[in-house]
Every structure is written in C-alpha cells, then in structure tokens.
Amino acid sequence: MPISKIHARSVYDSRGNPTVEVDVVTETGLHRAIVPSGASTGQHEAHELRDGDKTQWGGKGVLKAVKNVNETIGPALIKENIDVKDQSKVDEFLNKLDGTANKSNLGANAILGVSLAVAKAGAAEKGVPLYAHISDLAGTKKPYVLPVPFQNVLNGGSHAGGRLAFQEFMIVPDSAPSFSEALRQGAEVYQKLKALAKKKYGQSAGNVGDEGGVAPDIQTAEEALDLITEAIEQAGYTGKIKIAMDVASSEFYKADVKKYDLDFKNPESDPSKWLTYEQLADLYKSLAAKYPIVSIEDPFAEDDWEAWSYFYKTSDFQIVGDDLTVTNPGRIKKAIELKSCNALLLKVNQIGTLTESIQAAKDSYADNWGVMVSHRSGETEDVTIADIAVGLRSGQIKTGAPCRSERLAKLNQILRIEEELGENAVYAGSKFRTAVNL
C-alpha cells in the first residue's frame, strides 16, 4: 500500500528540548512516531541533527531535520512507492538517501522518525499490533516474552547533583510471576524509597530526575545501595528484587592517565584517589558480593577495551554495553571478538532505523548475549520501544522509574500487551538474559 503523505514537525521531549515527530499517512490512516534523545551520548552514535542556532532553543532546534523529512525524505520515499510492510527496503532506501555512515547528512533523528512511523503503518496494513509486526520482521519465535522492567529508581552521575559518580541504580523484579506483578513490586519499592530519601536527606530528596528516579545528596555507591536495600526490605521483597547499575563511566574517565575519577563532580578532585580499571573492577566485585547485583552497564569507558575484556573474564553477572557498543553493528562485532561484555543496550536512536536495530539484536543473540531495550533521558509519550522489547523477545526493558508519564507510557503499554496476549505470553523473570531462547 502506497504512502500518500509524510509530514514532520518539531515537538518537545520530557526535558523541554525540541525533537522530531513524523506522520506517515496511508489508506489505513495516520501513523505517528516521535524520536527520543539522550543526555550522556556516546561519540560513536548515529548523528542527531540539531540546528546549532544559539538564538533559538540554545542551539538544540531540530528544524533542519524536520525540513529534511518534509522536503527530501518524504517526497523521495513517496515517489519510490515501497510497500510499507517491507521495512528493510524502506530503511535501506533511507540510508542510501542519506549516504553517510552515521546519518549525518539528513540526521538520524529525521531518518528514525520516518522508519518508526512506517513500521506502524506496516503493522496497520497487516491488521496486527506493532509488536507482532516487529516479531515477524525479526523472525522471533512464540510465545511472546514480556520483559523484566529494570526501573531506574535512584540517580547519580550526569543525571543528578550530589557527588555520587554512578549514574543509575535500578531495581529488578525478576522473581515476580508476571509483568504486572513485577511492576506492582517495583512501584511499591519506589514509594518506600521516596519516603526514605525524604526522611534521611530532607524534603527535596524526593524530587525526581530526568528518568523519574530520586536524586538525594548521596556521596558513594554503598550509600545508594544501602538505601535501596532498605526500601526493598520495607516493601517486603528482600531476596525477590535484585539490583542493577548503569555506571556510565565514560563520564568520569580520564583518558590521558587512563584512570577513573569517582569524585568527578568536584573541581578539587584529588588525582591520587583516581582508580585504575583493575581497582574499579575490584570495587564492582565487592559491591556485587555485598548486594544482589545482577547487571552492570558501562562499567568502563567506551574505548577502554582492555578493561572490559579483563572484567568480563572474571565476573559472572550481566555486563551491558551501551556507550561501548552504541547499537552499532561494527562495535558489537568488535565487542564479541574481544569478549568485552555479554549484553547489548538497544537504543533505536543510536543506530537510526528499525531494521538496523533488529539486526543489532540478532547479532547479539547469535553470540548468546542478552539484549536490553532502552529509553533515552529525553523521552516522549511515544511507546514504540515497548512493542520492540516484546517483538524482539528481549526479556528486559529499561525505561525509567514508575514515575513521570513519558516513562510510564512504555510500562503501561506492556501492561496492555500482557492483557491482550494472555496465555500467549510468558514473563522473562530470572531468565531475562536468555529470554530469546525461552
């Protein structure tokens, strides 16, 4: 079925920054997608096109990307007359039209908006939900797998004030019997955590960060983990709810001396206290021995390959590559060859089309990696990643705390999918890393 209209506009994300929204119109109606954007972005990501005009939106406008959709991509794609159900052909055409390796010509934000809106049009034409269409495109087996929600309940690093270096502390309800129960457990722990943070650190500690987590004035990882452990205990889920961390260590890596500065937010940071990667690896291991940590994301800097391989050999929990792999097939291949990690963080806007995102997941599965589908810190009401997580059988999704509508939108969408699928879906639970094989 041909596309009759493609129209892009500038809308706002959850941080008040402009982002791209794309409408694709076919005989089945209007199909809309909004593109997210990140705060801590890896240097190997696909290029997000921003206007750079400091007099508007501080240079963060997306009018160029919008114009590229309306004047270049839209007319060309309509003229090409590709079937909207043929996602790989559409995405291949978009990449060819751009002509660069990192989508810097038309902008990954322009291309992704079109790619995702076309996927929704394709699902509508088949008369199936988006997750079912994605499952067909990826060739995943049945039953569907509902992901474990990794809920970012406490923020540090670049996402918060305070001296805490690590960026995210997540709760992982992997013992729950279903997705809806997992979400209930997470929400209950989150409420306890918020109350505890206010009690211990003052009223403002209940304020939430970009992703809905609390950001009390915490100095160390132990302090953060103790607070979360106490909240889990108060909610009655000790032993049932695990913990995951996203360290985002590229943010505090001193490349010139190859050391990590856990006090990076302090301008007077003492270089004698900076850690080598071996010392940082030992810190992670001591934390994992003391707390129920099942997953660590970006434990080392994005180009400190030696550190990743060293850590991988000596640890037994999930090691997730985000800045390391940036959902890029070439980087994933290198990480597999160097045995750097065992799970991929899948962010569709890092690679820029749905087809390449599916391929990144398949490449990861082929080497027995886990795949965690992820939001960005600048999010919107778009829920596509919920359908992607279910369609790919990824078994794990990271989309913030059970707080702030742009985070809940995804979790609520999975609740709807769970209800719709009934017996035809299983909850990944503790098998989240190997969910694709369930």
UniProtKB/Swiss-Prot annotation:
Residues holding Mg(2+): D246, E297, D322
GO terms for MF: IgE binding; magnesium ion binding; phosphopyruvate hydratase activity
EC number of this enzyme: 4.2.1.11
Cofactor binding remark: Mg(2+) is required for catalysis and for stabilizing the dimer.
InterPro entries per record: Enolase, Enolase-like_C_sf, Enolase-like_N, Enolase_C, Enolase_CS, Enolase_N
Binding-site list for substrate: H159, E168, E297, D322, S374, H375, R376, S377, K398
Active site positions: E211 (proton donor), K347 (proton acceptor)
Keyword field: Allergen, Cytoplasm, Glycolysis, Lyase, Magnesium, Metal-binding
Required cofactor names: Mg(2+)
Functional pathway: Carbohydrate degradation; glycolysis; pyruvate from D-glyceraldehyde 3-phosphate: step 4/5
Localisation: Cytoplasm
EC category name: lyase
Entries under CDD domains matching the protein: enolase
Highest taxon listed in the record's lineage: Eukaryota
Gene3D superfamilies recorded: Enolase-like C-terminal domain, Enolase-like, N-terminal domain
Biological process, per Gene Ontology: glycolytic process
Catalytic activity as recorded in UniProt: (2R)-2-phosphoglycerate = phosphoenolpyruvate + H2O
HAMAP family for this protein: Enolase (MF_00318)
PANTHER family: ENOLASE
Quaternary structure, from the entry: Homodimer.
Family, as annotated: Belongs to the enolase family.
Protein name: Enolase
Lineage of the species this protein comes from: Eukaryota, Fungi, Dikarya, Ascomycota, Pezizomycotina
Gene: enoA
